[in-house]
Amino acid sequence: MDQTMRDKLSQLVEELTTSGEPQLNQDKMKEVKKICRVSDSYIDHFYHLIMTQLNQEHAEIRLSAFQMVNEVFSRSHHFRVLLITNFQEFLELTVETDAEQPLPPPKEVARKLRTLAIQTVQSWHATYGEAYKKLSLGYHFLKQIKKVDFQDVEARTLAERKRQEEKQKRLERIYKEKLDKAKQEMEEMTSGIEETLTEMNNCIRLLATDDFNLFDEDSAASISTTAEDQSDQPCCSKDLSNEHNGKMMEKKTDKEQTDESSDESDMEEVPDEDAFLRSTGLMSYRYQLELDVSADLKVRETEENEALVNTVRDLHRLVTTRHLPLVQSWVQVFTKVGVEEELMRRATELKKSLEHVLRKHEYLHIDYKDRERLVMRAPEDGEDDDDDFVDVPEKEGYEPHIPEHLRTEYGLDETPSTSTSGTKAKPSRPVVKCAVPPVSSSLSRLKRRMCDEEQDPTCAAATLRVLKQKLHPAPSTSVPDGSSESAVSSSDQSNMTKNKASFKAPVIPFGMDLYYWGEEQPTAGKIIKQTSQHQFWVPHEVEEEVENKELSAQMKSRCITYAGKFKPVEHKCKAPMPNGSLCERQDRVKCPFHGHIIPRDELGRPVNPEDALRLEREKRKREEEQPDWRDPELMREIEAATGEDLGSSKTYGKGKKGNKGKSKKKYPNLTDLKQKANTSRSRLEKKVFNKSSMRRVTEVMNKMDKRKHEKFANQFNYALN
């Protein structure tokens, strides 16, 4: 066997199986078949190459390899014998007969491979089943043991069909539960929906008096047709036609009159046109009038229809938010599942009725009033409790004057008589038992309850009231003189200026030497010496104070760091890079990649000869320390001979030629299995399981555990947790 043809066959098989194409390249496949015709040894080598590719964990490689098997299987008896000898392993790698060894990804290609393999095995059995016993056994194994349906277009296995049946049963069970729930809801809610429709229709009919049946489509159509018939006649002719029609009815009832009398009566009934025009003063029978009548009906909310409008608004909200979505869900479930016609008809009629009543509501164009909501706000410091509620506008029709016979009932004093005093007396203020604003009954009850809670010493309201009184003491009732007032005002003004100055002034930390500047420190360098360190037994001796000289020196001295003036770095590293450029880092002393920075020229060569000699010695030393087998040229030769990557292309550092360490893909045409799909789950995983995020979470959890252990370190109960 020629080694050149052997290598060429290996290269062709690798190129065909790693192309990633759904179909084989016929030109290269012809070369493979041409080499296999030479000798059986090439077929043996081809068989081993194919089985190696079928064991790869990539569905695209297996699909291309199986297509090559199908091409050679029908042309070589020797290849058929080799393949059928190891037919069980071949089925495991292509048909997925072993559940513990599923086909590798991508899933779509794996599904296509399994379908193609089952169809091909069926065609092989039909053609070569009688000649090859193991092929027939393999076919019956798939059909009877693995329950493969060869007539199925998708050629699904037993496990797939079971999964599909379970999924279908689960969907049927879910739909059945939804159907039962919809039927139960329909039985319970139908009466309520019909009552809501009746109430809303009645309210709309009361708001818009429909004397002309505007909401009835049949009546509206009949009215429009009669209007169109009469639109071509003048107004006076319409009256004449009505009068003429009435008299014609009278003529039909009178059947005993002769033809002459009927003609005379007809002549008498028809008025003279000229006489009619002269009597009415009209110039012509036909006149054209243009009237702009608004077709939109608009209902305004007033005091008279306020109750109706509120009811319509509540019912409209109930229909739009509750009833209509519920009925639509019923119709959707009934459509998917398929129910009896009567149930579907009832649901459809309910839906149409709800939509019709909503169209009526839109036709009315109701102008709702703005509703004011009474909101309680939190009282600020220094405010009275009476200001906790928002002011309510006066009600329409309210009269501030209260009659005399009702003043006692309202708790007001009687108005003095006008005979005793010449001036008009003002009504006295009402007697208020508790600080409750007369807003409404609910507000008064709320304020009364708050007052009761303040009187109860066990409530939090009483404690808050005491704290408010302490923070904001009541002003004294005595009237100060002018001098005290001026003193207080001057002190307040000085305090305000100090506060402003302290607010603007920066806060700088200082030591004890500045705190006791110009004074003698009382406890400078003195510490208390405890002779006994026992936990329970303490001696009777008095603890003595000892002066520490180091501490005294620290209290009297200060160390001030002089930072100096910042000088920016103007030089660059300029060390040669693997890609041919120069290092642009501007470190002050040392570059983290190229060591100490030395002066270099524009080409990156050292300016000083001493630096050049030192760099040459360091380079020679590194080469001597490196083993001989790490020589790049030797490694490249070994790689070319063995076909394995020994790392000759890898360089120390950031990579070369600007690739930043990214190696070239060996088979770029194949689908990258390591590349994750850009889904929401992958994006969330990338953010949540990021190293920095995990580190921050770990630090926070460690701090929490540390605080817990420090707090409960001496309690044996928490030591067990």
Curated annotation (Swiss-Prot):
It holds the Pfam family DUF2043. GO terms for cellular component: chromosome; nucleus; site of DNA damage. Zn(2+) binds at residues 573, 583, 591, 594. The lineage of its organism: Eukaryota, Metazoa, Chordata, Craniata, Vertebrata. PROSITE patterns: ZF_UVSSA. Residues 478-494 have a biased composition (Low complexity). Monoubiquitinated at Lys-395 in response to transcription stress; this promotes efficient transfer of TFIIH to stalled RNA polymerase II. Keywords: Chromosome, Coiled coil, DNA damage, DNA repair, Isopeptide bond, Metal-binding, Ubl conjugation, Zinc, Zinc-finger. Belongs to the UVSSA family. Residues 240-258 have a biased composition (Basic and acidic residues). Residues 223-272, 409-433, 472-498, 616-635, 641-721 are annotated as: Disordered. There is a cross-link at residue 395 (Glycyl lysine isopeptide (Lys-Gly) (interchain with G-Cter in ubiquitin)). InterPro entries: UVSSA, UVSSA_C, UVSSA_N_a-solenoid_rpt. Factor involved in transcription-coupled nucleotide excision repair (TC-NER), a mechanism that rapidly removes RNA polymerase II-blocking lesions from the transcribed strand of active genes. Acts as a key adapter that promotes recruitment of factors involved in TC-NER. Facilitates the ubiquitination of the elongating form of RNA polymerase II (RNA pol IIo) at DNA damage sites, thereby promoting RNA pol IIo backtracking and access by the TC-NER machinery to lesion sites. It is found in: Chromosome. The keyword DNA repair applies. Residues 653-667 have a biased composition (Basic residues). Residues 223-234 have a biased composition (Polar residues). One of its GO terms (molecular function) is chromatin-protein adaptor activity. Residues 155-203 form a coiled coil. It comes from Danio rerio. One of its GO terms (biological process) is transcription-coupled nucleotide-excision repair. This is UV-stimulated scaffold protein A. Residues 6-149 are annotated as: VHS-like. It comes from the Eukaryota.
